[in-house]
Design a protein with these regions (language model features):
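Amphipathic alpha-helical repeat scaffolds of TPR domains
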Residues: 2-16, 38-58, 80-109, 137-153, ...
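Single-residue signature of alpha-solenoid repeat helices
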Residues: 26, 64-67, 121, 160, ...
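Short non-catalytic regulatory patches outside canonical folded cores
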Residues: 345-397
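Charged alpha-helical initiation segments
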Residues: 2-6, 16-18, 240-364
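Charged, amphipathic alpha-helical oligomerization/scaffolding segments
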Residues: 120, 202, 209, 313, ...
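Residues in the short coil linking paired helices within alpha-helical repeat scaffolds
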Residues: 22, 60-63, 117, 156, ...
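Flexible helix-coil transition and linker loops at the boundaries of alpha-helical arrays
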Residues: 30-44, 71-87, 125-140, 169, ...
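Elongated, non-catalytic scaffold/linker segments and compositionally distinctive motifs
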Residues: 126-297
Length: 397
């Protein structure tokens, strides 16, 4: 056995110590290996991820930081060009760990949204995702899962669910993606109205599947297994009859047979791109997933008959504008002979810069403008709802 192969074996042994939760032994072994083999490329590359995992396990900010700094340094070294995707991935995990060690859930939400470590993690994950298709399924699933965790920490829960779905497309039984998706779904369960029970049941079943998966500890360590088991217990407390949690949930697929050609396209297009406003996130191929029931609930003083109606007008207008923008988007993607003929009646100058002008492009541009206008109205609504001391701008409902 040559020296390089021996080092790989030692690195593998350190990784096993981490998976078993023996972090102090792992850091001692890594430091000893570094001392014996200074400036070794294999060690320099692998220690980035090892330091981050060990520091996270020991809750040692400085060890994690050391791993991140080492990784950032290697990214600037052209001799590690072939390893940059793995480096981006490890560094992103490091920034996530720095965030988790520095802040907790009780902190001000502004420190989450603008947190430098979270933003750095998001950027590094995205860099890794650009070229991830060249890697094996295991790495791709883990990358999408960790990116989902980052989005969830940023308060972008719906996008996090989409990231977990990407991981599960690669491996439908990937335990970390399955468990983390279930935990993200739990957040939405309590605000999903009539879907609350079904979402808790689905979350419980997914968590059990993840916690019983023999590969869970390999990918997430002992902490992930304990975390998932704790979530299962929390869900069980919500149900007097625990047998309900084993119920087989059925979601009959929506019926397209009675629809016109465009309506069918519209439903499938909006469903594919998740454009409907509902919390039926545990199943997207049934009738409940292709409607827009989302609204708000609020408590007003007895005798106050105006506040809720005034707020409702804001929401109605925002939802109406959204529905129109969505319709325009779908129309821009649906080729029709009558629109083709109408488009031909308007002459456009060829500006020689590859710009496109026609009815379909116009519909797409209008959808974009309408959507952007909605953002202004949402900001105005938030200002009114929370009675923020911000000057009004010319936004009309």
């Amino acid at each position: 056995m040559n020296k390089e192969h021996e080092m790989v074996q030692e690195i593998y042994a350190i990784s096993n110590l981490i998976n078993k939760g023996e972090y102090q032994k792992a850091i001692d072994s890594l430091l000893n290996l570094e001392t014996k083999n200074p400036e070794n490329r294999t060690i320099n590359f692998n220690k980035v991820g090892l330091l981050i995992d060990i520091g996270c396990g020991l809750k040692d900010f400085d060890i994690v930081k050391k791993g991140v700094v080492a990784g950032e340094k290697l990214l600037k070294d052209s001799s590690y060009e072939d390893y940059k995707v793995t480096l981006y991935y490890n560094i992103a995990n490091g920034y996530m760990s720095l965030y988790q060690l520095e802040y907790d859930k009780e902190r001000d939400v502004e420190r989450i949204v603008d947190n430098e470590n979270l933003q750095n993690a998001k950027r590094k994950f995205r860099e890794a995702l650009k070229e991830v298709n060249h890697f094996d399924s295991e790495f791709r699933s883990q990358l999408w899962t960790n990116y989902g965790n980052c989005l969830d920490s940023l308060g972008r829960g719906v996008e996090a669910l989409y990231a977990y779905d990407e991981a599960l497309k690669i491996d439908s039984n990937f335990p970390i993606a399955l468990g983390n998706k279930a935990m993200a779904m739990r957040f939405f369960a309590d605000i999903s109205g009539e879907y609350r029970e079904a979402m808790h049941i689905k979350s419980s079943q997914m968590l059990k599947s993840a916690s019983e998966n023999k590969d869970l500890v390999k990918f997430g360590g002992i902490a992930a297994k304990k975390g998932f088991e704790n979530e299962i217990q929390q869900i069980e407390k919500l149900f007097e009859d625990k047998r309900v949690l084993s119920k087989n949930l059925k979601h009959p697929k929506y019926d397209l047979s009675y629809m016109t050609k465009f309506e069918k396209f519209y439903i499938e297009f909006c469903s594919k791109h998740k454009l409907f406003l509902n919390f039926h996130i545990h199943e997207d191929k049934c009738e409940a997933s292709i409607v827009d029931p989302i609204f708000i609930s609020m408590v007003t003083p007895i005798g106050d008959s105006e506040t809720y109606n005034n707020i409702a007008k804001y929401i109605n207008q925002i939802k109406e504008d959204y529905a129109i923008a969505r319709l325009l988007l779908a129309q821009s993607q649906f080729k029709r002979e009558d629109l083709d003929n109408i488009s031909k009646r308007t002459t456009f100058v060829n500006t020689l810069d590859y710009s496109m002008f026609n009815i379909y492009v116009g519909l797409l541009k209008s959808a974009f403008k309408e959507t952007y206008n909605i953002l202004d109205k949402i900001s105005r609504f938030i200002k009114e709802y929370y009675k923020l001391n911000i000057k009004n701008k010319n936004i009309y409902f």
